[in-house]
Amino acid sequence: MTGTPLRVGLVGYGLAGSVFHAPLIAATPGLALDTVVTSNPERQAQARAEHPDVRVAASADELWARADELDLIVVASPNKTHVPLATAALEAGLPVVVDKPVAGTAAQARTLAELAEKRGLLLSVFQNRRWDNDFLTLRRLIADGELGEVYRFESRFERWRPQLKGGWRESGDPAEIGGLLYDLGSHVVDQALVLFGPVTSVYAEADVRREGAQADDDTFLALTHESGVRSHLYVSATTAQLGPRFRVLGSKAGYVKHGLDPQEAALRDGSRPGASGTEWGAEPEELWGRLGAGESPVTGGGAPVPTLPGDYPAYYAAVARALHADGPNPVTALEAAAALDVLEAARRSAAEKVTVTL
């Protein structure tokens, strides 16, 4: 992409801002990280050290005052700030990327989408797990008909973290929009909708298991899709023995994949997309999933399938193209609203111990 890079203002420099958004923006041709907003002095120093040429501001108000100098706002601050910050950016005439979940409710997400449409501005949601290596591989296998007619999709995002970390993500205050249902659940629900389409019913169990915990830390969702596929989704911080990331069953074959996409770990370790001598998002052969059918107690049947490289950089590359009217919005707010419909139904299902029809 040629021409002057689009100038990006990034709000938030915690995990999402510093580990995911800032490195990916910096690695994207056509984008330039202009300003980082954080009120935390330690994070301000971190931002200056990691991005010496970038301005650091203490308040998002400094971005709105310079709206004519910026081309895109990225909201990577705590969940409860997503809606007010995205609204302020759109009202300032600036396109916006918002980290997931875009809002606490589907109604809020649709209101944001309406505002963006009214202003003629891009509003995109950062659902980076659409570019996980295992998810890209599974999409290809389904598209190629390798599994036949899929009837069951099992997706697990499990961790063993018996000790609480504290912070807003583990708060029991509904205003914080914390808990695993809205954190990791945003990913697994989005992936299920991308693969198998709209949902007609939701059953969920949401438990608080760790001592001192306030927010859900062990959650299960059972979705029935209009297509007939049933999705069983697990998100947990209390799993002492991890299950497969994916187990997908079809009329011809099944696909089982263990382990997590390597990109988050690489970003946390300081690796960057495009660095020489590395193949971004690749994993070793011993981690490949298996495709096929059988009853082997050791392998389950089938044979290893090469995992496609993960590609988080593809998200911001698509955003840059969309801002130049050269491609679609990679993740729309209305898509995110559909996922929030499911998450809200799951929360109600777990609270009332009922199956919720959508």
Specify the residue positions occupied by each region the protein language model found.
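Rossmann-fold dehydrogenase core element
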Residues: 111-128, 149-153
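Predominantly a Rossmann-like dinucleotide-binding segment in NAD(P)-dependent oxidoreductases
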Residues: 129-212, 353
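C-terminal helix-rich "cap/oligomerization" subdomain common to oxidoreductases
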Residues: 1-5, 62, 72-74, 304, ...
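Hydrophobic residues in well-ordered beta-strands that form the structural core
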Residues: 17, 58, 75, 98, ...
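Contiguous beta-strand/loop segments that form the cofactor/metal-binding neighborhood of enzyme cores
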Residues: 190-273, 313-325
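C-terminal glycine/acidic-rich active-site capping loop/insertion
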Residues: 28, 252-330, 334
